[in-house]
Design a protein with these regions (language model features):
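Conserved TIR/SEFIR loop-to-helix hotspot centered on a Trp-containing motif
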Residues: 107
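A hydrophobic, small-residue-rich beta->alpha segment in the mid-to-C-terminal subdomain
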Residues: 153-154
Length: 200
């Protein structure tokens, strides 16, 4: 069993914002796998099979900073192990068009990830970071305004392709594990002209 959890804020006000790219990737997974969401405890939940693996796609409906509050529910219902949970979220330290898989790590200042670490009791869970680019201002207010802003028209074409790449990466995690997925996807980057492969 694998859990693919996209982070974001619920409601129309936040649709299409940089902070909600995790939700967008979760929606892309649901579409790719031909399934639909149902309502779980404080989350939207979809079920699918990838080859012989049961997959649950999860979007917490708690608002970003409380994302981890659904972890006890997932654990009590399905006994989710940290290594089987891929958390998908936005990252200001990566440029738009770049994704990065990691097997573990700190929150990097991301409050949704911080909440998941708290409720899981460990930093040892895989994550898929989606680049949203750095803000012009690095102060806290500037960063908050930035993550709640929408992508420019030029960025939208890139982020659409990036979402598809992230869906591919998440499914590679399900099929092949985190290390193989990292090898296949961490060196790839989407540009505004074409999809390119670059080596680090």
């Amino acid at each position: 069993v694998k859990f693919l959890m996209g982070l974001g804020n619920p409601g129309p006000r936040y649709e299409g914002t940089r902070h909600n790219v995790g939700f967008a990737v979760a929606d892309g997974l649901v579409e790719r796998l031909g399934t639909t969401y149902s309502t779980g405890y404080r989350c939207a939940l979809a079920r699918a099979n990838v080859d012989s693996t049961r997959v649950y796609i999860v979007k917490p409906m708690t608002y970003m900073n409380l994302s981890g509050e659904i972890i006890p529910y997932l654990r009590s219902r399905w006994g989710v192990a940290p290594e089987d949970l891929l958390v998908i979220f936005d990252d200001m330290s990566l440029p738009v068009g770049k994704i990065r898989l990691r097997p573990k790590g700190s929150s990097g200042g991301h409050n949704g990830v911080k909440s998941i670490i708290y409720h899981l009791g460990t930093e040892h869970f895989p994550r898929l970071r989606i680049g949203i680019g750095p803000p012009d201002s690095l102060d806290k207010n500037g960063a908050v305004d930035y993550v709640l802003s929408r992508f420019s028209s030029q960025e939208l074409a890139v982020i659409g392709k990036t979402k598809n790449l992230a869906v591919d990466a998440a499914l590679a995690f399900v099929r092949d594990g985190i290390e193989a997925a990292m090898s296949a996807f961490n060196s790839r980057q989407i540009t505004d002209t074409e999809r390119t492969d670059t080596s680090d």
